[in-house]
Amino acid sequence: MARASLVQPALWALLLLQVVGPAAAAKLNIPKVLLPFTRATRVNFTLEASEGCYRWSSTRPEVASIEPLGSSEQQCSQKAVVQARLTQPARLTSIIFAEDITTGQVLRCDAIVDLIHGIQIVSTTRELYLEDSPLELKIQALDSEGNTFSTLAGLVFDWTIVKDTEANGFSDSHNALRILTFLESTYIPPSYISEMEKAAKQGDTILVSGMKTGSSKLKARIQEAVYKNVRPAEVRLLILENILLNPAYDVYLLVGTSIHYKVQKIRQGKITELSMPSDQYELQLQNSIPDPQGDPARPVAILTQDTSRVTAMQMGQSNLVLGHRSIRMQGASRLPNSTIYVVEAGYLGFTVYPGDRWVLETGHLYAITIEVFDRSSNKVYPSDNIRIEAVLPAEFFEVLSSSQNGSYHHIRAIQSGQTAISATLTSVVDQDGGVHVLQVPVWNQQEVDIHIPITLYPSILTFPWQPKTGAYQYTIKAHGGSGNFSWSSSSSMVATVTVKGVMTTSGDTGLSVIRAHDVQNPLHFGEMKVYVIEPSSMEFAPCQVEARVGHTLELPLTISGFMPGGGSEVVTLSDCSHFDLVVEVENQGVFQPLPGRLPPGPEHCSGVKVKADAQGSTTLLVSYTHGHVHLDAKITLAAYLPLKAVDPSSVAVVTLGSSKEMLFEGGPRPWVLEPSKFFRNVTSEDTGSISLSLLGPPASRNYQQHRVLMTCQALGEQVIALSVGNRPSLSNPFPAVEPTVVKSICAPPSRLTLMPVYALPQLDLSCPLLQQNKQVVPVSSHRNPLLDLGAYDQQGRRFDNFSSLSIQWESSRPLLASIELDQPMQLVSQDDGNGQKKLHGLQTVSVHEASGTTAISATATGYQQSHLSEARVKQPHDPLVPVSASIELILVEDVRVSPEEMTIYNHPGVQVELYITEGSGYFFLNTSTQDIIKVAYQDTRGVALVHPLLPGSSTVMVHDLCLAFPAPAKAIIHVSDIQELYVRVVDKVEIGKAVKAYVRVLDFYKKPFLAKYFTFMDLKLQAASQIITLVTLDEALDNYTATFLVHGVAIGQTSLSASVTDKSGQRVSSTPQQIEVFPPFRLIPRKVTLIIGAMMQITSEGGPQPQSNILFSINNESVAAVSSSGLVRGLMVGNGSVLGVVQAVDAETGKVIIVSQDLVEVEVLQLQAVRIRAPITRMRTGTQMPVFVTGITSNQSPFSFGNAVPGLTFHWSVTKRDVLDLRGRHHEVSIRLPPQYNFAMNVYGRVKGRTGLRVVVKALDPTAGQLHGLGKELSDEIQIQVFEKLRLLNPEIEAEQILMSPNSFIKLQTNRDGAAILSYRVLDGPEKAPIVHTDEKGFLVSGSGIGVSTLEVIAQEPFGTNQTILVAVKVSPVSYLRISMSPVLHTQHKEALTALPLGMTVTFIVHFHDSSGDIFHAHNSVLNFATNRDDFVQIGKGATNNTCIIRTVSVGLTLLHVWDVEHLGLSDFVPLPVLQAITPELSGAVVVGDILCLASVLTSLGGVSGTWSSSASHVLYVDPKTGVAIARDAGSVTVYYEIAGQLKTFKEIVVGTPQKIVARRLHSAQTSIQEATASKVTVSVGDRSSNLLGECSPAQREAIEALHPESLISCQLQFKQDVFDFPACDVFTVEPGFDAALGQYLCSVTMRRLTDKQLKHLNMKKTSLAVTASIPSSYTSVEKVGAEVPFSPGLYANQAEILLSNHYTSSEVKVFGAVESLENLEVKSGSPAVLAFVKEKSFGLPSFITYTVGVLDPTAGSQGPLSTALTFSSPATNQAITIPVTVAFVLDRRGPGPYGASLLSHFLDSYQVMFFTFFALLAGTAVTIIAYHTVCAPRELASPLALTPRASPQHSPHYLASSPAAFNTLPSGRKASPPSGLWSPAYASH
């Protein structure tokens, strides 16, 4: 409590926030610290936070301080030292806070300072062994409560070794124990211990070690004086020798085996063996426990003391104990012991070293150990006297050595493979050499896998350094081992390796050793080295640099670098395939570099691949740049075309003496660097039979050709060989050489052939006539055939050249065909299609257009000698045996095929016929494609049958085999699968009627298939539902369409889809076509009865949904007119019918079709009489009923005449006013309808009696013919009896009843529902059938009968009282219904409205009454509501059956009819007139700039006006409170007037752009000169004279002023003529305004203060001011009409003042001004001595009057200077100007008289006169100033129109007030109203 009271409350609040806050991630190392109280030393404790940087503080620094650890520059630290600071011995606490400077998190630790009450020494053991590690002893301090202090750091202790009085015979010596310092040990102490040891002090922790065996006692006490009474702490330690027993573990022996034990001790870090038996120690066997089956009398084992050997005698166990021989030591220390188990051998085990894995490697040495285990898997000690026989296969192992007992073998693995080693424990040999064979030998074997050593390939890899990790990967191959390896890298910064041996380079250079360890034996591994170095050079390795076009060249790269370590050894990189090599080709298009790089190879590390694209040569440059390393290499490449024999391709045949020019193409080109190495060789077998010669160099650079001319000199065959290439060179070490061979044959012709030249030589077909009639060929009789002569040798090979032959031609019938001499045979070499040219002899045969047969023959008679001589043919040669050929020609017409184009369906069963006519009759038919169609020709019929195979287009070509020249006759066949189906059907069908659906199947070209294919397609038309039925019709619209009849059987919507089966059996369906089966389209009403001028709207029911537009028409347009919306208006008496048609558009044809139609009869009549429709004629007082006017028939309802134009008026009256009240139908909501709407009224029964109800119907325009006989009025009257309601007078109570209609129900409710237990019961006699029924919940249900029942309601109160009421329940039929409306409308002055407000939503409630007028509480009527038109109101169902909601949407009259569906006699009619509730009525268009004072009489119940709003404030802004609206922009807007929670009405306003803006000068009577300085111009925006619309209230006028409508316009000024050098705005100012009284905008123009220069200029020239106004600049097309404002700048004088004297008695002054001002200019003088008279008048331009000013009395001024003024004023313009006049009297020195000398000479000669004149001028000026301030200043006007022009202070003498008051104002009688304009006050020049 004491320390808590010291903490500030604010701090506690902070702590509380931090403690209860969310846990932070940072933590302190300790929550509480207990520190000892000290005086001499300070005990520290380090606090440390896990993370963050903190500001540390202590709540009580005097108890415990806190010091942060770290740099002094930082304001925070993560560690801090807590130090006990308490000066008085007490237990106190300080709270340590650490606040994170970043997050604000606060950590807390409590630091407690207390006294030490006791200490104790803590150790890990109390026994020390000689030469063992030292023991650490630590002091632990406790307070009075036994709490342990957190630290004793820094507290000084005294550690001493004292005498041990309890040694019990042990040697007690200070030398037995030694206290060590940490400085001389190998252990790290706490930092404060090191500091204390340096100061030769001992802390709370020390080290001790044993010096010799014995016992020692250690004592520690606190050195601090405060704790002198604290009891020291003591500890006794025992120091022993370190004795070991070998083996020290438990031993398992077999019977008969033995083990030798050794006793050892550790001395100076070495283990030495003690000779046993010893003086100090002895071995003993104790606790011998034989096996249960053993002999208890025999020992389990015996110990031979001399040899320390234990021999197992029988199965069991025994303990071997090492003990002290000295009795005093036997209980003081614990010596080692061992347990010996004698067991039976269970099985053998095998181990191998190294690795302990039975996976070995050949060539390695291994130690195999065979171990014996008992049945419990305990390892048996392998005694030397056991015998184990091991079998190690000699082909796998080389045994180097073995142990005597056979348990150890040193071997070498010599062969790989799988084998097994086995071992058998057979016997035990005793000490005497006796062999004891085991009855059951123990045998086992071990499988061994031996592998060859692991080697990695390659052994060295060298990679270039790349900046990114993983640039190179290489899969290292490992051989040997088990095949399953684990991989490792010695330096992962250089290279890494994956589990699959994939090496990846890292980011550093250097060496990494990759090892692959055998997973089955990790000791086996193979390794290789990976170097990562920087490259230093790059070059291409020798390779092939020539390639055929299309082939690829691989260009290997060799990149070298220096080995790591700084040496000069260069090594070739193993892999540089990931180098970012830049490959550049000098000549683009020859070689194309291929993506990717060559994989590394033995002689290269990477490389590029290029593809030969075109023949030519280029240079390839490969470069690499990274950082400071830049390498490049260049190589020249060449591409060539393959060498091939073109002509001939293989064999050339010529006749003797003929030659053949052989053409070869391609082959290597001359090497670009050494062209001289290029060669071409051509050889033959026998150079004497043929001559060969190369024709010129290669033809061109781009297309290399080799031509060899071969000439036949002797008959025979030869092989010609050509080889092309380059010889090896330095830049082309592996050149390409291309060889090729052809055969040459020189032979005589064995036969000749004659063939017609056909237009299609690709058809290798012969005419059948040629085979049947031997060389009979039909040809066209209209074209000359061309015959081709060919020569063949004995092998049937055609001659390449037979030009050395001599040929003779003949014709058998020259009249049909002849050989003309002027058309000799042309020898032409033509390509035979294989590139080889053959000689053709082309001979033209002339035909003469006659049919018949002729024979043409050609004969080779011998050789031409000229050819033989030129070819140097060897002589003699064999003569030629003549050969000949003939051909018979038949002249015929050309072939034709029909049809030429058609489309067929792809189906196996489809076939079409092509008709072939004319021609030779021998035809070959083929197609342009092989897989589209199959064509079969029936020659007997001349018909080709076409079968489809696959979709597509193909051309059938009919070749006439026996006509040589004509092109084939063609027919284009399109084979198509089904692309889509198209269903055309009207989407609407009336139930019970039918429409036709048309289906077409389209091919791929969107063309329809023929209908004959539909049978192959299984065409079906299906409907998605059963609302329609489908019938297939046989009639066909065309050859492509299937027709179906769609019959509507049920109402709904479905879809039609056609489907067919294609060739593959898949169904193909069309897009579903929606079709609607709609109910019969019916127009309502079925008959329309109207009078002339009345209107009724025809509506519809049924028909398609959503309903399309209905087209209305009438058959007799003179009787009535019908609008597009179905509104029928009566025109004249008569009958007609209105047809309503529902149309739809045919999707395919686009034609409009009629879906459904209906007729309505229309009767236009005259009202012959009227009747009052009253549901009852007897009514009870206090009830009401509706009455309305009808015609004489039931069809003549108010719908027939209620809205006629011109209208009818209805006037109601009663004969006795006190019996009935007549009220309008909407009287309850304060609407009083005018007479023209009062066709229906409400009748209220007031008092009992009988009265007549009369109505008079008057025609507003009798000539309209609405009443029979052009009558003016009709009337009717009925009698109504009002009777009094039955009441009880004694007692005077109200007897009420529940009124229900038959078959209705009501839920009864009482005021005790939920509070009392209610029960309901109908009290009727047992003989009377109940009229109503009720249940326990209060549901009252009436039956079909009528009558009265009694209902008992009992309430059982919880306090024990019962309440009972009896209620009569009357069941009666409904007699009539009545409509009422809500809500009630309130107006400002309680006046009634004449119509419903536009935009209002009202609720109509239907009330049901019985025959007495009482209202039913429950009924079962189903009501219908209808209006005579739907464009003025919107009607909708209400929340209950007897309500409807109507919203008024447009101005006009609508009639509402409500009736009971089951009882048509229950009906009512009410008028619904709708008018605007917002005024004013806007006759014309509203334009931008108009201001509207909107108003509405509607208010809330309390008389509060509503709020105004606009749908678009940027178009029309409306003040929400007053309703003032300003049109700002063109557009349509809706203004809303809303009374919150009651109603909302609106008015639609269209704001247009004004066509013109007119400014007019405002003529006003100005009464003062000051007002003449301003002028106002009215601005009319638009065509109206006023821009203020509506009647504005005072509040609205204030709102207009606050809204500043003048901001909408801007006013502009300019001079009408540009006659001044300054603009009008420098002289005048103009401001826009708005005058609410005028309702117009204004431009107020004011003249500024003018400078003398401006005043002078304005007077010198005359013009007027043009004022225009404009609205925002977006309306650029607005016409602007300006106003012309005349202005007068004011009077101007050419002198500022006048000086007169007795010498100069007169002076002239010119006064300038407007003509209006100068015409009646008056002048007045302030002194009689000074006069002014007109000298000259000039009313030209400029206008001025010259005045002569003189002194009347020459002696004036003799008594002193006379100062006065002349005032020039104009009554017409109220302008005036004042000129000061000074008269001085000057004496003449030279003469006695005053008139002797001139004024000037006296002035110049008299010094006094100069001073006099100066002071006179000063006096005059002073008088003027005083007069100004005295007279003018108080008279300044403040009217806004009197904006006086400003002037600078030096012009002040020229203001109006500068003249005396007497001249300042004209007499009122003389003041004339100046013309409206701008007038300046008086100005004068200086």
UniProtKB/Swiss-Prot annotation:
Pfam families linked to this entry: Big_2 (PF02368), Ig_NUP210_15th (PF22959), Ig_NUP210_16th (PF25354), Ig_NUP210_1st (PF22967), Ig_NUP210_2nd (PF22969), Ig_NUP210_3rd (PF22963), Ig_NUP210_4th (PF24991), Ig_NUP210_6th (PF24935)
Biological function: Nucleoporin essential for nuclear pore assembly and fusion, nuclear pore spacing, as well as structural integrity.
Compartments, as annotated in UniProt: Nucleus, Nuclear pore complex; Nucleus membrane; Endoplasmic reticulum membrane
Signal peptide annotation: 1-26
Recorded GO CC terms: endoplasmic reticulum membrane; nuclear envelope; nuclear membrane; nuclear pore
UniProt modified residues of type Phosphothreonine: T1844
Boundaries of every BIG2 domain copy: 1078-1151
Protein modification: N-glycosylated, but not all potential glycosylation sites may be used. Contains high-mannose type oligosaccharides. Phosphorylated at Ser-1880 in mitosis specifically; not phosphorylated in interphase.
Residue numbers on the Perinuclear space membrane side: 27-1808
Modification sites for Phosphoserine: S1839, S1873, S1876, S1880, S1885
InterPro entries listed in its UniProt record: Big_2, Ig_NUP210_4th, Ig_NUP210_6th, Ig_NUP210_9th, Invasin/intimin_cell_adhesion, NUP210-like, NUP210_Ig1, NUP210_Ig15
Glycosites: N44, N337, N405, N484, N681, N801, N926, N1039, N1116, N1135, N1362, N1441
UniProt similarity note: Belongs to the NUP210 family.
Gene Ontology BP, a term: protein transport
TM stretches of this protein: 1809-1829
Main location: nucleus
Subunit text: Forms dimers and possibly higher-order oligomers.
Cytoplasmic compartment segments: 1830-1886
Topology within the bilayer: Single-pass type I membrane protein
Name of the protein this chain belongs to: Nuclear pore membrane glycoprotein 210
Keywords linked to the UniProt accession: Endoplasmic reticulum, Glycoprotein, Membrane, mRNA transport, Nuclear pore complex, Nucleus, Phosphoprotein, Protein transport, Signal, Translocation, Transmembrane, Transmembrane helix, Transport
